[in-house]
Design a protein with these regions (language model features):
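Non-catalytic, mostly N-terminal accessory regions of nucleic-acid modification and defense proteins
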Residues: 1-91, 150-161, 254-257, 293-308, ...
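Alpha-helix initiation and N-capping motif
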Residues: 16-19, 49-52, 106, 236, ...
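Conserved, well-folded catalytic cores of nucleic-acid-processing
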Residues: 25, 29, 58, 62, ...
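Low-complexity, intrinsically disordered short segments enriched for Gly/Pro and polybasic residues
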Residues: 34-36, 279-282
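Glycine-biased, low-complexity coil/linker segments
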Residues: 38-40, 283-286
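Conserved S-adenosyl-L-methionine
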Residues: 70-172, 177-181, 186-193, 204-205, ...
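A conserved structural/catalytic subdomain of Rossmann-like adenosyl-cofactor enzymes
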Residues: 164-279, 292-348
Length: 348
């Protein structure tokens, strides 16, 4: 964590006794709890990391809620992240988030692997974040959980830290409708295969950046404002049309409003797939497992009626909601053990 923690922690006037008490309190979390019969010290350490991670995640969520709109710069609600992760199912390979905020996508990916009895070492994590404060939050978030990642601080569009990366999975929640991305300096960029995005809105710059970094059998899942599905301003409609005609759009999910701390407007999830006949192949070697051939097809899921209000301004998706959305996608895709897909009027 060198260069990450604020310099205030090293200043001479700091109450060293109080700081020591805090350090001891954190150090005691789960490390000194009795071990169940048959479990070794490694289990205790894992529990300690998980507990610390949960505490950190809790405070991130509380901070994002208190900050309101500005909180959206670093925090994606955990339930939205879980929808993305459950649908992409990143068991093995390279996971990439070019605007990773506080690192929630990475944390959720590792949780998914653990929940499905996978091996953490089977995935490699790459990312980039332009906001220095947010980058520091992510570094601490990952360090607390013992997650190893190749994450960089810098502008993804203008100084791509992973220019040659071809990822098996891309997960992201880019800034909505960002007009301050200096797009006028990148008009002829090689990433704009489907058309130069407008300088006043980075939505389709992000989409094409994701596509650029996808492996031949790669999958991408990301959050965008609902306007991305219908906007025709400044050539956005033509870019969207070109992406659709390239048969990259695998699934679209319309989510209910009030899920985010930063905005009350409804958002949607985009899922792109380069190869609609195979699952991702770790490391880009050949092809992965076969699934139903969905070339020329796209699944639409209308989840706008799901979720429940947890307070006056915020809604949250339940575990049942998550299972319903992800289950429909995996059944449609033809994943092993997902069951038969059936159209449900008003939902999919």
């Amino acid at each position: 964590l060198k260069g990450v923690l604020p310099k205030d922690f090293g200043r001479a006037g700091l109450d060293k006794q109080r700081l020591g008490q805090i350090i001891n309190l954190v150090s005691d979390i789960a490390f000194n709890s009795p071990l169940p019969a048959g479990e070794g010290p490694g289990v205790r350490a894992d529990r300690a990391k998980d507990t610390l991670g949960r505490v950190y995640e809790y405070f991130l969520a509380r901070f994002a809620s208190a900050e309101g709109k500005s909180g959206g710069q670093f925090y994606t609600p955990s339930r939205v992240v879980r929808v993305l992760v459950e649908m992409l199912a990143p068991y093995k390979g390279r996971v990439y988030d070019p605007c990773y905020g506080s690192g929630g996508m990475f944390v959720s990916s590792e949780k998914f692997i653990e929940a499905h009895s996978g091996r953490i070492g089977d995935i490699s994590i790459y990312g980039q974040e332009s906001n220095y404060t947010t980058w520091r939050l992510a570094k601490m978030n990952l360090a607390i959980r013992g997650i190893d990642a190749q994450i960089a601080h810098g502008d993804t569009f203008h100084r791509d830290a992973h220019p040659d990366l071809k990822a098996d999975y891309v997960l992201a929640n880019p800034p909505f409708n960002d007009s301050d991305w200096r797009g006028e300096l990148l008009k002829d960029d090689k990433r704009w295969v489907y058309g130069a995005p407008p300088a006043g809105n980075a939505n389709f710059a992000w989409v094409q950046h994701f596509i650029h970094h996808l492996a031949p059998t790669g999958l991408a899942g990301f959050v965008l404002a609902n306007g991305s599905m219908s906007s025709n301003q400044s050539g956005e409609g033509e870019i969207r049309k070109a992406i659709i005609e390239a048969d990259l759009v695998d699934c679209m999910v319309a989510l209910p409003g009030q899920l985010f701390y930063s905005t009350q407007i409804p958002v949607c999830l985009w899922f792109l797939r380069r190869d609609k006949r195979h699952l991702p192949s770790p490391g880009g070697r050949g092809v992965g497992g076969e699934v139903r051939d969905r070339r020329g097809e796209t699944l639409f899921i209308d989840a706008r009626k799901l979720g429940t209000l947890v307070d006056r301004t915020h809604r949250e998706l339940s575990d049942a909601d998550l299972a319903r959305i992800a289950g429909a996608y995996h059944a449609w895709r033809g994943d092993k053990g997902a069951g038969a897909y059936t159209d449900v009027p008003g939902f999919c």
